Amino acid sequence: MDLTLPLDYQAIERILPHRYPFLLVDRITEFELDKRIVGIKNVSLNERYLSFDGNGRAALPPTILTEAVAQVGAILILAKPENHQRLPFFAGIQRVRYRRPVHPGDVVEIEAVVLRLRSRMGLLKGVARVNGVRVVEGTMTFALGDTSKS
């Protein structure tokens, strides 16, 4: 797996099974195997899943933002050679805090850090920021399944 930075949308498609409109990561800018990763999500007015915040402005729903954080974390986990043929499953979220809405035109910087990694399960801490300000943070549990058919 080629992890020459920055990873663009096409390189990310070779790692994750997600496709448009559910692939929520546009670019990977930083990567340390088994430690941390930083990705970018550019929020556009053309997003299919925009909702409206309390002020009537278009906003990215918090659940979609959480999924974007999980996808960045999945790239970190799948980059490990022994996980190339595995499929990550989002198993749970803990202590998630949504700080402020994310609007079209925002560039979301997403960081995921490994807290614990075992052969089939793990825990990541994720933080998303816009202009250096935290917009969401929390920990995510994931499980790894095999893609081979028995």
Question: Residues of each region from the PLM?
Answer:
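Beta-strand-rich interaction surfaces with strong enrichment in secreted/lumenal proteins
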Residues: 13, 56, 98-100
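Catalytic strand-loop segment that frames the active site of acyl-thioester-processing enzymes
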Residues: 20-60
